[in-house]
Amino acid sequence: MVNSLTTPEPQTLKPGVKAPVQETLLTPRFYTTDFDAVANLDISANETEIRAIVEELRADYNRHHFVRDEEFKQSWDHITGEKRRAFIDFLERSCTSEFSGFLLFKELSRRIKSRNPLLAEAFEFMARDEARHAGFLNKSMSDLNLSLDLNYLTKNRTYTFFPPEWVIYTVYLSEKIGYWRYILVHQHMQEHPEYQFYPLFRKFESWCQDENRHGDFFKALLRSQPQLWKNWKARLWVRFFLLTVFVTHTMTVFERASFYESIGIHPRKYNNRVIQETNNTSARAFPLILNTNHPLFFWRLEQCWENNFKLAAIKNSKLPNFVKFFQRIPPATAIFWNMLRLFLIKPIDTEATRGTVL
């Protein structure tokens, strides 16, 4: 049994327009970066592969796939209660994440166009895909009588600065983990069509193909920059980003456990499989991957969630703030301790077998 939070009732900015979810460590974030540094990236070490992927992006294989067919044109009022709230929450967070990618890629494309046209073109194509996804998700929300004001989000969301190196690490992992999230839900729906309560799920196969291509681009970009994988500092950063992405994913899945249960997916099994597959896929890009077979690996990930669950309960309590401060210390310390122990698990060297991995 997974401890999970009850999905709150949606709040609105005005009739039919949902108020954005409160920003936390688990909500999708908006990013900016050093555009000059990206423009000056030397990609010659892997330019052939990058050009090949840009041509795939140009082909836009999914341009006709995201069409709202007749199946969407009906009332969805029969989706009620926690199932409806959890589905709206899933749509909102997914839409916000895709829109965040669109804004970052679009700005990258605009800022570097004159100095690095090949990368600018790639970012333009990926921005196209992210905008298509975000629009489709937002339209799905409108079927449930709500939608996001994306212009409001653009102007009012907090933007987090990441240097280009961090952007490459995190976006690569985000796209690849997104691929595995979507493809596993798609495969589950193929085997259990009785859980397919909304036609959006039929689009997940095409969706995951876009995520995979974006991940392939960032993998090629990463491998063109030896400083991102060919020294001890890079190895430490890779371990850090793999770990933080997997901890965040675990917390997010368990937080939304009611949504996954509503579509017949066991949250723990789903989370573990997504992490294992993403970790294995990352061997194609990174000099190392985490040892997910360690007997305490997933237990410690779940301890991070259990203590985050305690932090949420403390935050929502009506106790005085000074009492909450002291109550937060043990679970916050436990999260840090479990993450440290996970970080110290000996990783798996992938460069030693690079010829067989690629």
From Swiss-Prot:
Any one GO molecular function term: magnesium-protoporphyrin IX monomethyl ester (oxidative) cyclase activity
CDD domains: ACSF (cd01047)
Cofactors, names only: Fe cation
E.C. number(s) listed in UniProt: 1.14.13.81
Reactions accelerated catalytically: Mg-protoporphyrin IX 13-monomethyl ester + 3 NADPH + 3 O2 + 2 H(+) = 3,8-divinyl protochlorophyllide a + 3 NADP(+) + 5 H2O
InterPro entries to which the protein is assigned, alphabetical: AcsF, Ferritin-like_SF, Rr_diiron-bd_dom
Biological pathway: Porphyrin-containing compound metabolism; chlorophyll biosynthesis (light-independent)
Keyword annotations: Chlorophyll biosynthesis, Iron, Metal-binding, NADP, Oxidoreductase, Photosynthesis
GO biological process: light-independent chlorophyll biosynthetic process; photosynthesis
Class of this enzyme: oxidoreductase
Functional summary from the UniProt entry: Catalyzes the formation of the isocyclic ring in chlorophyll biosynthesis. Mediates the cyclase reaction, which results in the formation of divinylprotochlorophyllide (Pchlide) characteristic of all chlorophylls from magnesium-protoporphyrin IX 13-monomethyl ester (MgPMME).
Family: Belongs to the AcsF family.
Protein name from the UniProt record: Magnesium-protoporphyrin IX monomethyl ester [oxidative] cyclase 2
Taxonomy of the source species: Bacteria, Bacillati, Cyanobacteriota, Cyanophyceae, Nostocales
